[in-house]
């Protein structure tokens, strides 16, 4: 998959679009195909190395808000199915084609809302 990676903590100019390994969900997690994301102050601070990702979050892929479709579910997931439209907030990694989040951290996108509006 492709992701915007911080290769040099210098702001947006330190980002590169690169191929990275696709994440695999744990038993209580879902893999989301990201359809839209957002840009906020915390994202910019991450690209400058001033807002480090917490443990467990991708340290080099910024992005906090996302909207997309469930692409895979972990073995214990009961809340979501492949194809469900979800949105949410992650600790990092939303500037990628796919991300992993705990099933409890995703929210159903309300009917009539686009992916861009949801992100």
Name each model feature, range by range.
Residues 41-48:
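Cytochrome P450 core scaffold surrounding the K-helix E-X-X-R motif
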Residues 12, 39-41:
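Short, acidic Gly/Pro/Ser/Thr-rich loop/turn segments
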Residues 1-4:
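Short structural boundary motif marking the start of a folded domain
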Residues 11, 21, 111-114:
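General structural signal for secondary-structure boundaries
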Residues 6-14:
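Extracellular beta-rich ligand/substrate-recognition surface
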Residues 45, 72, 79, 85-119:
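NAD(P)H dinucleotide-binding glycine-rich loop of Rossmann-like/cofactor-binding domains
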Residues 21-38, 50-93:
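Glycine-rich beta-strand-centered segment in the early N-terminal region that forms part
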